Amino acid sequence: MKKMTITLGPRNYPITISSGLLNHFDSFEPLKKGDQGMLVTNQTLAPLYLSSIRTVLEQGGVRLDHIILPDGEKYKSLASIELIFTELLKKWHGRHTTLIAFGGGVIGDLTGFAAACYQRGIRYIQIPTTLLAQVDASIGGKTAVNHQLGKNMIGAFYQPASVIIDIDCLSHLPLRHFSSGLAEAIKYGIAFDFDFFCWLEANMDSLLRRDVDALSHCISRCCQIKSKIVMEDERDENGLRALLNLGHTYAHAIETETNYIFYLHGEAVSIGMLMAAQTAQKLGLFSKTDIIRIKKLLLRAKLPIQGFHQIDPKSCLLHMMHDKKVMNDKLRLIIPTAIGQSEIYEGIDNDIVLASIKETLM
């Protein structure tokens, strides 16, 4: 078992990483006997896990209700938030209840945002079941839903009471979704940690076999990197946390342009990181050799390195102008300057960005 703590002034919460955590009531901290909870999950996971989780929690003395939502990014919406609120009110959940997010990034975002809003804020627990959520989305307190004009446009900073990462949940994850999570792990290597990037190169085959030791190291290293950044820049105020968005401005534009249907988030991030690297190369900040190295690792992770559904580059650029990091009508992009290093660049010529999008999509 690996455990770390995120400390934010007087607030702190644990992240626990191991196999078999869902089998033990003590794993579900800070729940205790007599508590009331509402588990939020989706139609894919409910048949696999709902009954066993209910048994563990009810044997521990928790009064548990649940809501099952449709599965998919297109359901990360205000309509789904309304469904959660309605269920909480119908089942008489007050300010001392606990929401439990059991799912991937969509469920985590929905549950966290609902917790931030319901009766002006209630406790919630993150139990991420996808690799993407385990290495990234469940940590740091960013919660949001999408709008038709942009991804993650409506949300709040709201930290969970704990994060419970059971590696066994990955056994049911389809390969495409598993690879989507690997994109976020690779992002940490490109943006922050050259040694971790090298480790990913050396251990990609073990990760794809879902070797428990390799997964444990990968997840814990990603959590360590993100935890450190969140503790230094919780609300994205000094620019450090923004570096976690390497490739994401491009990726969110791809997802918005394709209506969240054709690309998983990690697939869009994979393409977006290459767009960022191409932009950096055009600015003389990044080598072609390193772009080739990144492409090779992404391909080994079964990730796309170019568009596989028709995308209009000019529309992508327009969507990018809606990004939350835009200031004074100027794009602010996270650009790699070497493998393991990244910086924020403002005011990059739109023609350079557009050319990078076109080249990567070809």
UniProtKB/Swiss-Prot annotation:
Zn(2+) binds at residues 184, 248, 265. This is 3-dehydroquinate synthase. Binds 1 divalent metal cation per subunit. Can use either Co(2+) or Zn(2+). Catalyzes the conversion of 3-deoxy-D-arabino-heptulosonate 7-phosphate (DAHP) to dehydroquinate (DHQ). It is found in: Cytoplasm. Pfam families: DHQ_synthase, DHQS_C. It comes from Hamiltonella defensa subsp. Acyrthosiphon pisum (strain 5AT). It catalyses: 7-phospho-2-dehydro-3-deoxy-D-arabino-heptonate = 3-dehydroquinate + phosphate. Pathway: Metabolic intermediate biosynthesis; chorismate biosynthesis; chorismate from D-erythrose 4-phosphate and phosphoenolpyruvate: step 2/7. Its EC number is 4.2.3.4. Coiled coil: none annotated. NAD(+) binds at residues 71-76, 105-109, 129-130, 142, 151. Belongs to the sugar phosphate cyclases superfamily. Dehydroquinate synthase family. GO terms for biological process: amino acid biosynthetic process; aromatic amino acid family biosynthetic process; chorismate biosynthetic process. It comes from the Bacteria. GO terms for molecular function: 3-dehydroquinate synthase activity; metal ion binding; nucleotide binding. Gene3D superfamilies: 3.40.50.1970, Dehydroquinate synthase-like - alpha domain. The gene is aroB. Its cofactor is Co(2+); Zn(2+); NAD(+). One of its GO terms (cellular component) is cytoplasm. Keywords: Amino-acid biosynthesis, Aromatic amino acid biosynthesis, Cobalt, Cytoplasm, Lyase, Metal-binding, NAD, Nucleotide-binding, Zinc.
